[in-house]
Amino acid sequence: MEASASKLIVACAGNVVAVTRRDPELMDVLVACGCRVVINDHADQGMGTSIAAGVAVTPATGWVIALGDMPSIRVDTVLTIVEALRAGARIVVPTMDGKHGHPVGFSALYRARLQSLAGDTGAREILKTDTMFADEICVDDAGIFLDIDTPADLKVQH
């Protein structure tokens, strides 16, 4: 989580909200990285509630929805997503070899829909219904696919 948060802090000029369950040790790490921490007491109900909680506390003009278990995403990939949002993109999806990855950027047009998310599908439904508004950006970054779910996953990535 620390590696993911640190990269996002750099790419997003320090404007990072980390949404997590109530875990004092994790919260301390995130605050030390420079994140604003929001507690999601409904985290057990799925990723959608975490996205909704993070969007609700920010007056942002767009969001890069990133997962804490994807520390291999490069800073320049996140910067490219941020720049596309600033240039007027509605949704920005990084791709490599024709496959979609993470993180995904959403403009302020999606505030209400992001705030109403629930369940464990995250923003996937928005991507399905609004695919015609998604800008795909090609990146040379396999990190957009790599998540760490177990200690073995971490060993494979190193």
Identify what each model region corresponds to.
Residues 1-100, 108, 132-139:
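Nucleotide and nucleotide-moiety/phosphate-recognizing core
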Residues 29, 84, 113, 117, ...:
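Residues that form generic nucleotide/phosphate-binding pockets
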Residues 68-69, 110-118:
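Short, glycine/charged-rich beta-strand-loop motifs at protein surfaces that mediate ligand recognition
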Residues 75, 113, 153:
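Conserved protein kinase catalytic core
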Residues 77, 110, 119-123:
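Internal, well-ordered alpha-helical segments in soluble enzyme and binding-protein domains
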Residues 102-106, 146-148:
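Short glycine- and hydrophobic/aromatic-rich loop-to-beta-strand nucleating segment
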Residues 116-158:
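Conserved alpha/beta core of the MobA/IspD/sugar-nucleotide pyrophosphorylase nucleotidyltransferase superfamily
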